[in-house]
Amino acid sequence: MRLRIAILIDDFYPSSGGIGRSVETQLEELTALGHEVTLIAPDRHLQKPRIGRVIECPTLYVEGLPAHLSILHWSKRRARLISEVASFDVVHTQTERGALGLGARIARLQGIPHLHTFHANIAGTHQTVHGATFGTLGYQALILPGLRIARGGGRAPSARLPAATSETGGLAARTDWKSFATIAQLADAYTVPSPFMRDLIDEAAGRRLPGYVVPTGYNRRMKRAIDEAPRERADGAIRFLSVGRLAKEKRLDVMIKAFRRAALPHAELVIVGDGDQRDRLKTLAMGCDSIDFRWHLSSTTALAYEFRNADALVLSSYRFDSQALVIAEAVSAGLPVMYCDDRLTVGVSPRTALLTGPDVASMAQGFRTLADGPLRASMAAASAELMPDLAPARTAERYVEAYTDLIERKATRG
């Protein structure tokens, strides 16, 4: 069955980090499966994809602010205008701002199911970003009431705080999961990239909701670039690689301290990325010639070169990432992975990755463990076992299964 799918996103496309990359994969892979995909995205900073259809939507946004503060217009009029030019079989929203309300209105107008994907673990921001509480309050004061209005009113679904043992990030973090559980019940179903997110949402809802775990697979262009990149190292050093934003929640300060404590001869740490922690991290690395900052690499070829010439990927975030897409990229490059967040289960296994504690001493020991060449070689070889489940086509197939299930259930309910 050929489906007509509307994908809605508040963030600028495609330059908005992991969410933009996930949406890009969805567009490409769903189209490759023969489905008709329409992207409804902000009309600012838009780089139109060469496939599918694009409907540009006005957005509330002040230039210069972060992209996650962009809000699509979600009025009844906007939903009606879109419905006059396009009919869909399913609406799939990707962000919890204007896109969520607009998607709900379109679904209601056209009598079709509404699927929502929770990409980000916003509950993980509270441990390092002090202003994150304002986001929690924003959900309670604006997003949830707005979504109820878009759905046509009615009683608010029941939700509760998950247990403090399930979410250890404090009251604000537990409140975020309660908000997610409310949103999940106001949509027809939801998806998440990792099992732990589904468990927390369903716990907050007090019951098992219609939900699906759909990890984002590796990017085909990145995989092709990695395969084509030359391996140009003959120095004999062990190169550990970190890729991502230089932000507090990524805890690169812990990584740098751990690497320095490990004091490995003939080892280097290459850090790719940029962000507001740049100066602090440079200061922490001062005097250590084996730590090299490559800053932001916008070229796929340049980033692929770093993966190809590394010996292991290191991830230091803890209780923040929802999936960590960089793990899928590391697997596609055949790299062992060292990480410290036990809730991350996508793209890792005991044969391919080393789980450490989140503290400096534990990560330092992890660096020492991965200094073992035969161990790294064994882990790299085992990474091939994970590739089929991380294939981007598998991501699209899982979404189609969810769409079909929702459409059939809605038809049965009449």
Describe each PLM feature range.
Residues 139, 143-226, 235:
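Donor nucleotide-sugar binding/catalytic pocket of nucleotide-sugar-dependent glycosyltransferases
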Residues 350-361, 368-374:
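Conserved acidic donor-binding segment of nucleotide-sugar-dependent glycosyltransferases
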Residues 89, 188, 308-322:
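Acidic donor-binding loop of glycosyltransferase active sites
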Residues 184, 296, 305-310, 399:
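Short alpha-helical donor nucleotide-sugar binding micro-motif in glycosyltransferases
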Residues 279-298, 312:
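Nucleotide-activated donor-binding/catalytic signature segment of Leloir-type glycosyltransferases, i.e.
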Residues 375-390, 401:
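A short, well-ordered alpha-helix in the C-terminal region of glycosyltransferases
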Residues 327, 332-339:
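Short hydrophobic beta-strand element within catalytic cores of glycosyltransferases
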Residues 191, 230-259, 270:
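Conserved donor-binding/catalytic core segment of Leloir-type glycosyltransferases
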